[in-house]
Amino acid sequence: EGQPLESCVLEKDEDPQTLHLGAFFNSKLIGIISAMPNPCPDFTKHRSFQLRAMAVHPEYRGMKVASQLIQAVLNQVKEKSTVKTVWLNSRVLANPLYLKNGFEPIGTPFEIKPIGLHQRFIKQLHHEI
């Protein structure tokens, strides 16, 4: 929020393995999330996906839209049987959302300028046999 439109374009957006999901209400886009293959700096030996570009329209926050997007993207990533971990850098204000969705914090908070204080989170995927 509050960033220039160009900041919405991310490296690997066009990668064929990258996932872009949206949440809609009455045909209106109310939330987005992306997940892309990207090694986690803390678990470089595992094939990982990074969650990025999570956003929910302010009028729809607090309605579990973000959790539904996270679960939808996790379900799709789990289908890629070689992916072991999903990770992200969360704004610290959003930390409760990721804790609620089974992610674990790693390390200490760090600054991403000009956005603010962030915390890295990781979730180990358990593939059903």
Predicted feature locations:
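Short hydrophobic/aromatic beta-strand element in the GNAT-like acyltransferase core
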Residues: 7, 18-22, 32, 53, ...
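Conserved acetyl-CoA-binding loop-helix of GNAT-fold acetyltransferases
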Residues: 56, 62-75
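Generic C-terminal helix-cap and adjacent flexible tail
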Residues: 125-129
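Active-site rim helix/loop that mediates acceptor-substrate recognition in acyltransferases
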Residues: 1-26
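Conserved GNAT acetyl-CoA-binding A-motif
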Residues: 77-90
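Conserved beta-strand in the GNAT
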Residues: 22, 28-39, 50-55
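Conserved catalytic-core motifs of GNAT/GCN5-like acyltransferases
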Residues: 87-89, 99, 104-120
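A conserved beta-turn-beta hairpin within the catalytic core of GNAT-like acetyltransferases
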Residues: 38-54, 61, 80-82, 115-117
